[in-house]
């Protein structure tokens, strides 16, 4: 007796803006999720052929292998400067940087502050996992008070290291005409909210309205010394209380 075959409709697939090369990230790392969101947005806005991504130092340094668009590698922290030059020479391009906190909030602080203050027409995806992941788990500018790292095993002491940098709040002060938001990817609801914010940041550039940055709170289970599930719980319990989610600057709020 022959069984009838039902044609299955594919309802979930890899974004067209991503290559087939597997992710190099540790289990539970948030970079893979965020990469996919960026690629989905590029597909939906139909901007892949005109997109140019800027790769920066850190765990995501090899993302030029993941995004199926033109990519440029920048020196450590210099992504916004490279993006600025590229966008000014090729205003028709959709230029974005993808940076971690050890890149953007440390050696690259000057570049991101001035790019935002000029309201450069670029998009920045900024991943904040509170630690230098690629180099062994050292303290980052975003490491929380008391958080233990390989460079400060006793935990961050604000009297010695200062306080963690809230980049989204800082940039909203120097660039009130920009779109600046902080989101998280610790569960499905917040993943979808992150995607919406990424789409808005790209739309700012497409419309010629200026600078857009989305700070994404992500997990680094390897350097946090936690399993993936507990890492997501830590984002809710410890990270978000210091780095509250929200939209800190948006042109729609003016007036």
Language model segments and positions:
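Thiamine diphosphate
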Residues: 2-133, 196-200, 207
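Flexible, low-complexity linker and terminal segments
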Residues: 2-11, 15, 20-21, 205-255
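Glycine-rich beta-alpha junction loops
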Residues: 57-59, 129-131, 187, 215-223
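Short, hinge-like loop/turn segments at secondary-structure boundaries
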Residues: 69-71, 115, 140-144, 230-233
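Active-site-proximal loop->helix
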Residues: 109-114, 134-148
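Conserved thiamine diphosphate
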Residues: 140-207
């Amino acid at each position: 007796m022959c069984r009838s075959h039902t044609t299955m409709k594919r309802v979930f697939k890899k974004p067209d803006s991503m290559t087939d090369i597997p992710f190099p990230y540790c289990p539970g790392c948030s970079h893979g999720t965020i990469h996919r969101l960026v690629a989905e947005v590029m597909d939906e806005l139909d901007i892949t052929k005109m997109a140019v991504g800027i790769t920066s130092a850190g765990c995501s340094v090899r993302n030029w292998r993941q995004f199926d668009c033109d990519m440029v590698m920048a020196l450590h922290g210099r992504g916004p400067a490279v993006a600025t030059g590229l966008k000014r020479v090729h205003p028709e391009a959709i230029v974005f940087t993808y940076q971690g906190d050890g890149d953007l909030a440390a050696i690259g602080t000057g570049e991101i502050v001035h790019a935002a203050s000029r309201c450069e027409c670029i998009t920045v995806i900024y991943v904040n996992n509170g630690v230098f992941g690629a180099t062994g788990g050292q303290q980052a500018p975003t490491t929380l008070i008391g958080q233990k790292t390989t460079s400060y095993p006793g935990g961050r002491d604000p009297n010695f290291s200062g306080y963690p940098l809230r980049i989204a709040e800082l940039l909203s002060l120097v660039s009130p005409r920009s779109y600046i938001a902080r989101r998280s990817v610790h569960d499905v609801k917040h993943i979808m909210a992150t995607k919406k914010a990424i789409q808005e940041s790209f739309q700012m550039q497409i419309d010629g309205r200026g600078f857009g940055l989305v700070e994404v709170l992500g997990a680094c289970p390897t350097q946090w010394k936690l399993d993936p599930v507990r890492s997501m719980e830590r984002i809710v319990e410890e990270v978000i209380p210091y780095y509250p989610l929200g939209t800190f600057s948006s042109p729609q709020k003016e007036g």
